[in-house]
UniProtKB/Swiss-Prot annotation:
UniProt key word Phosphoprotein: no
Subcellular location: Mitochondrion inner membrane
Any one GO biological process: mitochondrial electron transport, NADH to ubiquinone
Predominant localisation class: mitochondrion
Organism taxonomic ancestry: Eukaryota, Metazoa, Chordata, Craniata, Vertebrata
Subunit structure: Core subunit of respiratory chain NADH dehydrogenase (Complex I) which is composed of 45 different subunits. Interacts with TMEM242.
Annotated family: Belongs to the complex I subunit 2 family.
Keyword vocabulary terms for this entry: Electron transport, Membrane, Mitochondrion, Mitochondrion inner membrane, NAD, Respiratory chain, Translocase, Transmembrane, Transmembrane helix, Transport, Ubiquinone
Gene Ontology molecular function: NADH dehydrogenase (ubiquinone) activity
Claim: Protein transport is one of the keywords in the record: no
Gene that produces this protein: MT-ND2
Protein name as annotated: NADH-ubiquinone oxidoreductase chain 2
GO cellular component: mitochondrial inner membrane
EC number: 7.1.1.2
Source organism of the structure: Cynictis penicillata (Yellow mongoose)
Length: 347
């Protein structure tokens, strides 16, 4: 893809998300979603092959269906309230339809089936955008309608997402699918806290985007797509191996790394709201995610396949320009826990 075309498409993707973030009118929200969806399709098809075309088609059909359900909910609310502007007094039917539509866009269970398939069929860089930037717009709308959401609808989807995100990643060897199931699980955590402290959901989203972006960038730098290729990283770049180990444990939410912050604060907030069963289930199902992250770290660091590489190990990177952005991202992805007391403003 030529640079001017790519820049135009990326600007359209960003503009669509910004329109959704800044809108208080349902029609402009829908326009922003459609701009974003139509612009992301060429990015998903950047590597033109049958798998990418199939993945783009699945994404298009899913997002178009979700937009249709969202507009049906908006139409019902229009009949109920007589206005197009967002309000905190949605009728129950409109709120339920909007929640289902946003769950489809985010890939929450039971509407999660498209996430692993689409992520596996596209390039790593496209997967990075799909699993990070594309979550911002739907979560912003979920944030705005959170006072009207029925907990009996969203909480089961959140728990199921964390459970499926853990189970689905257990038998995977493809790194993109593992990150896709990780995304489903993280979306479940965000959906669970949206009902009780939407601001904490923004914190969770920020940390998730930083950690996932760093992981994708390390995989792209190392040209790793499977656990087998990841296990051979030690022969090429021991430093990357160590960084991947830390990032995997952080994504799994293991203290004292950054990924522990959102899980800790979400469980604490749910407990404050006299929810005992939900945080217990979330904490138990998070062990599934931690297991396959631990398996990845074991594959990366503690197993060494036979290698005929007689060259010296690359303790220094040849092209440091690519690593410039990674340095601060890795620090933030792993070492944020000491600043947790400063986050008391979210209470």
């Amino acid at each position: 893809m030529k640079p001017p075309i790519l820049i135009t498409i990326m600007l359209t993707v960003v503009s669509g998300t910004m329109i959704v973030l800044t809108s208080s009118h349902w029609l402009t929200v829908w326009i922003g979603f459609e701009m974003n969806m139509l612009a992301i399709i060429p990015i998903l098809m950047k590597k033109s092959n049958p798998r990418a075309i199939e993945a783009s088609t699945k994404y298009l059909l899913t997002q178009a269906t979700a937009s249709m359900i969202l507009m049906m909910g908006v139409a019902i609310d229009l009949l109920y309230s007589g206005q197009w502007t967002m309000s905190k007094t949605l009728c129950p039917m409109a709120s339920a339809m909007m929640t289902i539509a946003l769950a489809m866009k985010l890939g929450l269970a039971p509407f999660h089936f498209w996430v692993p398939e689409v992520t596996q069929g596209i390039h790593m860089s496209s997967g990075l955008i799909l699993l990070t930037w594309q979550k911002i717009a739907p979560l912003s709308i979920l944030y705005q309608i959170s006072p009207t959401i029925n907990p009996n609808l969203l909480l089961p989807m959140a728990i199921a997402s964390v459970l499926i995100g853990g189970w689905g990643g257990l038998n995977q060897t493809q790194l993109r699918k593992i990150l896709a199931y990780s995304s489903i699980a993280h979306m479940g955590w965000m959906a669970a806290i949206t009902l009780y402290n939407p601001t904490m959901m923004i914190l969770n989203l920020t940390i998730y985007i930083i950690m996932t972006s760093t992981t994708f960038m390390l995989f792209m730098y190392n040209s790793s797509t499977t656990t087998l290729s990841l296990s051979q990283t030690w022969n090429k770049a021991p430093l990357i191996t160590s960084l991947i180990l830390m990032l995997m444990l952080s994504l799994g939410g293991l203290p004292p790394l950054s990924g522990f912050i959102p899980k800790w604060m979400i469980i604490q907030e749910l407990t404050k709201n006299e929810m005992i069963i939900v945080p217990t289930l979330l904490a138990m199902t998070a062990l599934l995610n931690l297991y396959f992250y631990m398996r990845l770290t074991y594959t990366t660091t503690l197993t060494m396949f036979p290698s005929t590489n007689n060259m010296m190990m690359k303790w220094k990177f040849n092209n440091t320009k690519k690593m410039t952005l990674l340095s601060p991202l890795i620090v933030v992805s792993t070492m944020l826990l000491p600043i947790t007391p400063l986050l008391s403003i979210l209470d």
